[in-house]
Amino acid sequence: MKLTKVVLVTYPDDFILNEGKQLVLSIPNYEIVEVFTQKYLNHAKYGIGSGKAEEIEKFVQETKGIEEIIVDNHLTSKQIYNLEKLIGVTVKDRERLILDIFFTRATTVEAKLQIQLAEIEYEMPRIREKAKLLSNSKERAGKGGMGEYIVDVHFRDLKRQMSFIKEKLNDAKLKRKIYQHQRQKIKMYVVSLVGYTSSGKTTLFNLLTDESKEISPNLFTTLSTITRSFKVSHNKKHITRKKGEGILIVDTVGFISRLPTYMIDAFKSTLEESIVADLILLLLDSSEKIEDMRIKHLNCLQILEQLNVDKSKLITVLTKVDKIDRRIIYEIVRKLGINNNSNSN
């Protein structure tokens, strides 16, 4: 597989920098050649500062084979256009990168529809801006161009696509509600696994259900909810697992920081499995730095709040505790304010 050499531009914060690298490397053929950092990525012309943009342009000219610049923040069409014109290679922002990752991961019809919806939401605000940019660059409006008429047609077409996709997703939502009602009638309890991407959700899911779902350090390995049964029977020495009635375990889409609202909305029908669960296990990787855990914990709680999740159903679970000293567990619980006994986090 031919590698695509990219330059990452991100913030000089360790957590954000590491997450940015993870995102880029989640695209199978991407190779990070260099990382540039800057405190502010919201400058008017390029997103990044003019001096930093010129520094990157010089680096690209001196380094053969670089094909893309990834800016770890939201960029407007104008900023992307300006950067591409200056540097001479493709520029993508954080949201475009996440959408690209989604496309490489989607396997179910519903997941693909959700990604298409998110992409339309990403593109619609940019259409008229792109038209203005092309007009300013003296591209001929009209047939084959991006004149006002062409833009209006494209905009209406995207709105029709959006309506069609929402209708299909609503059909899937209704089917899910019927399934949920059937579960309630036969008294099937539902336990939902949520948390930051790569927190160990799928590992725990496989352990509890005897499944063999793919486990990967890459982000967004899971894009669709998977539900399997789990039966618990106790004795004094151990807990045995059997497929059967009693409890259903649900593995969900992994969370990530700075996920735009429209992307959360696109996956809302899938994430609703978390809302209707009888118990929600919020997983945190205890082998990470406590400060990173704190940030991820807050990010997860914010997303769950957006989904109107009942916090009384929520229990925080520390994973990978075999990799750390037991004393650190108490420090994590104290610093993150975890108090599962009172059902508050």
Give the location of each predicted region.
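Conserved C-terminal guanine-recognition region of P-loop GTPase G domains, centered on the G4
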Residues: L17-L25, E57-Q61, H74-G88, H234-K237, ...
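Short hydrophobic segments within beta-strands
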Residues: V9-Y11, V194, L283, V317
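N-terminal accessory targeting/assembly segments
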Residues: M1-D100
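Residue-level signature of catalytic and energy-coupling elements of molecular machines
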Residues: G20, I69, I120, L158, ...
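Conserved G1/Walker A P-loop phosphate-binding module
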Residues: L134-I264, S274-V276
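Canonical P-loop GTPase G-domain recognition
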Residues: G88-A141, M146, S312, D322-N345
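Hydrophobic residues in beta-strands of the RecA-like P-loop NTPase core, especially within AAA+ ATPase
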Residues: K92, I249-V250, L318
